[in-house]
């Protein structure tokens, strides 16, 4: 049996349907608004396809239509398209306004989260500096003139920073804050606040965007 392995995540499903229906779906650039009822059309076209289930299609469509690049494409005067790229009517103003509102709310959440992270990082840095100065004042003077290496120097400074919204892209390398330190990983899938990453040991996990750093 040729290439019959079942797809495992929404990213793979979106890539697959974009390959099957290139005039309707795209994996990069601005997406086209989809025909109302496109799920039913997809389910019928792929009914005999063992690689993808209806549940996977529904989840992938939800992620696809809530992505920033899809919401950017929902504009006044633009036509919806079916699986074959045929126009299916101009977008209604109500749908355009809804998409614009959803996009702005999503971006506002990212901006607020980045601001909170910056404030928390600044507070932690200030607190750490105060503790360092306090410990330094209590330390006895060395009995010899040989320079003494501070234990703090043994731990490299954290030069990571919070991700910007534009850096949250599939394939980008990031650092995942695991509490005890940052772990290198790469983004394999994202949907608003949740991001699926793959660690260097091959383990995949879903984390919140605030736990990702660059």
Curated annotation (Swiss-Prot):
Record Pfam families: ProQ, ProQ_C
Skewed-composition ranges (Basic residues): 133-154
GO annotation, biological process: post-transcriptional regulation of gene expression
Keyword match NADP: no
Residues annotated as signal peptide: none
Keywords from the named record: Chaperone, Cytoplasm, RNA-binding
Location within or outside the cell: Cytoplasm
MF (Gene Ontology): RNA strand annealing activity; RNA strand-exchange activity
Region described as Disordered: 104-163
Gene Ontology CC: cytosol
This protein's record includes keyword Metal-binding: no
Family per record: Belongs to the ProQ family.
Job description of the protein: RNA chaperone with significant RNA binding, RNA strand exchange and RNA duplexing activities.
PANTHER family, sorted: RNA CHAPERONE PROQ
HAMAP family recorded: ProQ (MF_00749)
Name recorded for this polypeptide: RNA chaperone ProQ
Organism expressing this protein natively: Photobacterium profundum (strain SS9)
The gene coding this protein: proQ
């Amino acid at each position: 049996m040729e290439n019959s392995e079942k797809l495992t995540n929404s990213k793979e499903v979106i890539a697959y349907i974009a390959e099957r229906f290139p005039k309707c779906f795209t994996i990069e650039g601005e997406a086209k608004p989809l025909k109302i009822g496109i799920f039913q059309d997809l389910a019928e076209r792929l009914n005999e396809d063992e690689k993808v289930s209806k549940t996977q299609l529904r989840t992938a469509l939800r992620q696809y239509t809530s992505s920033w690049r899809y919401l950017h494409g929902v504009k006044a005067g633009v036509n919806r398209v079916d699986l074959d790229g045929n126009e299916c009517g101009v977008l209604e103003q109500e749908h355009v306004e809804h998409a614009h509102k959803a996009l702005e709310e999503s971006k506002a959440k990212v901006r607020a989260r980045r601001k909170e992270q910056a404030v928390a990082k600044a507070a932690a840095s200030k607190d750490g500096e105060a503790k360092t100065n306090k410990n330094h004042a209590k330390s006895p003077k060395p009995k010899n003139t040989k320079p003494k290496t501070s234990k703090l120097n043994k731990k490299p400074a954290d030069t990571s920073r919070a991700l910007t919204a534009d850096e949250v892209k599939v394939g980008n390398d990031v650092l995942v804050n695991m509490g005890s330190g940052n772990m290198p990983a790469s983004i394999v899938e994202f949907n608003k606040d949740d991001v699926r990453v793959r660690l260097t040991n091959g383990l995949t996990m879903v984390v919140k965007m605030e736990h990702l750093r660059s």
